[in-house]
Amino acid sequence: MKFYCFFLIIVFSINITFCQDSNPIDSFTNSIGFKKDSLSNKNLPSIKKYLIFKNYSDTTYIDTSLTIKKLYKFNFLRKDNLEKLKFSNLGQTYNSLTFDFENSSLPAFSFSSKKDIYLNSNDVNYYNIPTPLTELLFKSVMKQGQFTDVLFSTNTSENFNFSIGFKGMRSLGNYQNILSGLKQFVFSTNYKSKNNNYRIRTHYVSQNLENRENGGLTDASIINFESEDNLFTERSKLSVKFENATSYFLNKRYFFDQNILLLKLKNSNSFSLGHVFEYETMYNSFEQADSSDYYGSASNQINDKTELKTVSNTFYTSLKSKFFGNVMVSYLNYNYSYKTNALSTNHEGFKENENSISFALKKSIFNHDISGKFSKNLFGNRLGDLLNFKLDSNNESEINYSLGLDILSKHSGFHFELFDSAYEKVSWSNDLKLLKIKNLFFKINSNLFGSLSLDYRLIDNLAYFELLNNDTINNEGEVNLIPKVNQYENTVKYLKFKWQKEFRFGKFALDNSIIYQSVSQDQKVLNLPNLITRNTFYYSNNVFKRAMFIQTGFTFNYFSKYFADEYNPLISSFHIQSEKKIGGFPMLDFFVNAKIKQTRLYFKAEHINSSITGNSFYSSPSYPYRDFLIRFGLVWNFFN
C-alpha cells in the first residue's frame, strides 16, 4: 500500500510541475532526477560495447529500447510466454500450450511444474562491458508482495568481468493457500588472457521456490465460481482441495568452462583443449500437515522429498580450419544419484556413472552455415543418443531461411521411472523405454510476409501421468488425484505452424503471432489446442519534445478449447484428463508503456474483459485463470 501511495504522489507531483512551470519539459525531466543520459555522453562508449553472451549462443549487447517485444518479456520468466498458460498467481506453474523438448541426450528435467522457473546452465548470462552496469526491475504482484530482479556487472579489467544477480518474489494470491515465493541468486565470472590463449567462465546459481498448494477448486467451488455470484467475487471464499500443503524446490549449481589455445597459425587455423565441469543438486519436496482423501491413506507424516545430484565432466578438443570449419570432439562423463522419499529410512534410488562421445561441426559455404552434432552413449542405459543437422542462409538479402533435422533418444525423467510417497498408493518403479523424437523443421524470415516456421515431429515412447482410477472420495462426486505412470506404445505425430508479422500504419502498428498445431494419435496422451493467437494493436510516439517515448494499445490472446492437462501438486507435474475442456475464452489487456532516458515504465490492465465473457476461464480444469488486475513496473539501467 505504501508503494501505491508513493506512486500516486510522484504522478501528482509531476502534474503540479507541469501546471506551474513555464518550461514544463525541463521541469519534467528534472523532477524525476534525469540530468544527462549516460549513453548520450560522447565520452562514454557505444551501447554496442556492452556485450552479453551465454555459453552456447551468439553475443548480443544491452538493449534499452522500448519495443513491443520487450513488453512480451516483461513478466516473471522474463521470456516471451506466448506458448505458456499462466496460473492465477505469480510464481506458480505454467500449462504448456505447445509441445517442446530439450534438444539434449541427457535425461529430461523431472517435475515439469518447476521446469519453466528453473535456470539451467545455458540460461546464465556473462558480460564484457566498458563501465559498470546496474539493472533494476520492479513489478507489482497479485496481492501482498512484489517482484524484483537486480543485476550488477563490472569489468575489473579489460579481461575479467563478474556479475551478481538476485531475483526475489513473494505473492499471496487471490485464492486460499496459494502463496508463492522465490529467491534466485546468480554469480558469474569470465576471464580471458591478454593474448586470448586462455579463457574461463564460471557461475554459481542458487534457487529456492516455495509454493503453497491448494490442489485447485473443489467441484462445488467450481460451480460457485462459474455462477458469477457476487458473493464469490472475493476468490478467497471459494473452497479448495488442500489448505495445508506446500511444495519446495531447491537447486544449487557450480559450473566452469575453460579453454586453452594450444596452436594458432597465421592462416587462422587453431587447435584448443577445453573442460566443462558442472556439479548440481536438486531437491523437490511436498509437505502436508494431514493426509488427504484425494490421495488415499498414508503410512506416516506427509513429507515426500526427492533428491537428484549430478556431476558432469566434459573434455573436448576444438579445431578451427578454413578448410574443415569448426570441428569439436568431446567426451562426457555423467554421474548421477537419485533418491525418492529421501527422508524415509526405506528410501529408494539409484546411482550410476555413464559416458558418451560427441562430434560437432560448423562450416560456412556458399553463403550458408552448416552445423551438425552427433552424440553416442557408450556406457549405461539412461543417457540417450543425438543427431542434429541445420542449414542457415547467411546472406544479407531480405529473405533468410533455415532448415534442419533432429533425431534423439533420451530418458523421460527419473520421476517417471521411480517415485515413492508416504501415500500408500502413490508409488511406482518402472522399466521405461527411452523417449524418441524425430524433428524436421523449416523457418523463413522475410520483410514482406514476416516469420514462418514449420515443425513436424514423430514422438515414440511418450511417458505421461494419468489417474489410477476414477473412484470418488465423497458424496459430491469428487474424484481422487492418485497418479500413475504410463507410456504410449505407438507414434504421436505432431505438426506445428507458426507465423509472426507486424504491420505498421504510420504511428500505429498491429503485431501478430498465430500458431496452428495438429496431433495425430490413437489415444489422447498429448493434448494441445489447435489454435493459439496473440494480436497487439498499439500506438507509439515521442511526446514532451521527445523527452518521453510512449506505447499504448491492446493485446488480444486466445487459444481454442482442448482437454488440458491437470496440475497434480504431489508429483509437481501434470496428468492427462478427458473430462473437461478449457479454452475458447478471449483475454484482452490494455497497456501504456513509456521510456525516459534509460528507464522503461510499464502499466497494464490485465484481462479487462473478464467480467463480460463470464467465469469460464481456466489455466487447468480446476485452477481458474487470472481475473481483471492492474499491474505496473519498471526497468532501470545505470551505466556508470
Regions found by a protein language model. Give the residues of each.
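Bacterial Sec-dependent N-terminal signal peptides
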Residues: 1-27, 271, 604, 628, ...
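Sec-dependent signal peptide cleavage junction
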Residues: 16-74
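Coil residues (strongly favoring Ser/Thr
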Residues: 27, 37-38, 58-59, 63-64, ...
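Outer-membrane beta-barrel proteins
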Residues: 53, 57-59, 139, 169-188, ...
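Short strand-turn segments of transmembrane beta-barrel domains in outer membranes
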Residues: 107-109, 120-152, 173-174
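Exposed, low-structure sequence patches enriched in small/polar residues
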Residues: 129-131, 249-291, 300-640
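Transmembrane beta-barrel wall of Gram-negative outer-membrane proteins
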Residues: 146-168, 177-210, 262, 391
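Flexible loop and strand-edge segments within Gram-negative outer membrane beta-barrel domains
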Residues: 198-257, 282-292, 297-306, 354, ...
